[in-house]
């Protein structure tokens, strides 16, 4: 498993805000899949949706997932639907630790509405958006870690993710920051190693 930390979740979960904070605290690069798409297309996500449609955007996301395989130790914030296609959970989990930023639907919906241009909100009523959230939930539940963002700010969410990441053993016996797990640190200290 590579050292990427991949944030998934519904719109309004705070993936961008939390991702920036987390990257800063881990000393890593921050990447947003929507930014990768807008850089390639030369236009915003809402413009891509309006001009080319959702199917075209989803094809761009598929290409973006392939490009993410080139990343090895970044913090990556995904678009809300990127994780929610057959085979995507497995593909992204192969690239790093996937963290679902969960939350109460009503809270997420209000955050997304306040944030402005959200193509998946355009022309949809609250009930339709909730149905979309419920359809995506089974995918999100496949993440390696879940952090509930309801009632806490991005700083606290990032702190919870950092704590959870330190508990995950890596195949090399090192945590996401390259630190040996606590029991290995104690053994190294007894042996006089750093």
Regions found by a protein language model. Name each.
Residues 2, 21, 25, 71, ...:
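NTP-dependent small-molecule kinase module
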Residues 7:
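Hydrophobic anchor at the beta1->P-loop junction of P-loop NTPases
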Residues 10-13:
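P-loop (Walker A) phosphate-binding loop of NTP-binding proteins
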Residues 16:
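Walker A/P-loop
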Residues 94-138:
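A glycine- and Lys/Arg-enriched "phosphate-lid" helix/loop adjacent to the NTP-binding pocket
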């Amino acid at each position: 498993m590579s050292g990427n930390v991949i944030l998934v979740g519904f719109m309004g979960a705070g993936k961008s805000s939390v991702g920036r904070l987390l990257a800063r605290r881990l000393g890593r690069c921050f990447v947003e899949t929507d930014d990768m798409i807008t850089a390639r297309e030369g236009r915003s996500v809402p413009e891509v949706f309006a001009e080319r449609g959702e199917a075209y955007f989803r094809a761009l996301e598929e290409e973006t997932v392939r490009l993410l395989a080139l990343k090895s130790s970044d913090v990556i914030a995904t678009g809300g639907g990127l994780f929610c296609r057959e085979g995507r959970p497995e593909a992204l989990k192969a690239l790093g630790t996937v963290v679902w930023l969960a939350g109460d639907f009503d809270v997420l919906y209000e955050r997304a509405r306040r944030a402005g241009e959200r193509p998946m909100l355009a022309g949809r009523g609250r009930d339709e958006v909730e149905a979309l959230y419920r359809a995506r939930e089974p995918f999100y539940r496949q993440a390696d870690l879940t952090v509930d963002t309801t009632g806490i700010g991005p700083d606290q969410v990032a702190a919870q993710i950092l704590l959870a990441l330190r508990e995950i053993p890596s195949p090399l016996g090192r945590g996401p920051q390259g630190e040996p797990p606590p029991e290995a640190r104690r053994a190294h200290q007894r042996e006089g190693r750093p």
